[in-house]
From Swiss-Prot:
It comes from Saccharomyces cerevisiae (strain ATCC 204508 / S288c) (Baker's yeast). The keyword Ribosomal protein applies. It is found in: Cytoplasm. One of its GO terms (molecular function) is RNA binding. One of its GO terms (cellular component) is cytosol. Present with 80200 molecules/cell in log phase SD medium. There are 2 genes for eL8 in yeast. Residues 1-37 are annotated as: Disordered. This is Large ribosomal subunit protein eL8B. One of its GO terms (biological process) is cytoplasmic translation. PANTHER family: RIBOSOMAL PROTEIN L7AE FAMILY MEMBER. Its main location: cytoplasm. It holds the Pfam family Ribosomal_L7Ae. The keyword Ribonucleoprotein applies.
Amino acid sequence: MAPGKKVAPAPFGAKSTKSNKAKNPLTHSTPKNFGIGQAVQPKRNLSRYVKWPEYVRLQRQKKILSIRLKVPPTIAQFQYTLDRNTAAETFKLFNKYRPETAAEKKERLTKEAAAIAEGKSKQDASPKPYAVKYGLNHVVSLIENKKAKLVLIANDVDPIELVVFLPALCKKMGVPYAIIKGKARLGTLVNQKTSAVAALTEVRAEDEAALAKLVSTIDANFADKYDEVKKHWGGGILGNKAQAKMDKRAKTSDSA
């Protein structure tokens, strides 16, 4: 036989021969009994029996309820968030227009005061500031007046009723909008802990092209799919035990 080649396995498999090893008569096998009050139980995943802190318990219950119950399309649309790459580009643009901090504002006003004292206009000392707009009522009024160029909505606002109408309002007014994962991430854009919404009303000339590109990508994911998303309900997914029970019932009905 040529070197490197293996013999084909037997078609029906070779019968295994039992090894007759000599056993030590002094040792006895002691199979474990895992019944109640018997041997120490093997390690298992017991996280579902843990008594979690109340805030964790509420988070878990809320998550499970949103999966089990049927969720109307208006609320279910908040589970479709902006993809990671587009979100990174969006945050990169918005970070250029973060509102000024108290120290930055003080410095700007000092420069303006010095310029006015020298007989110049305050525009010479500091150019017009561009900033991200935030605050629910403020952003809603900007959308209604069609001043917002891009609106970001957080997907985890509680209660959700605060922002549930915003996608419909943006669609009606023709304002581009995107649903972003995490109100805390929006908060970083406006120097706050959290923010339900953030909007851009105007950008500098050098960022116009980047904004236009972002808007076209975001519209393809949200505004253009709005009518399709309205048709789909969320939730209604059974747990493992309930699913197994349904499968068993279906199997018995098929066999009958």
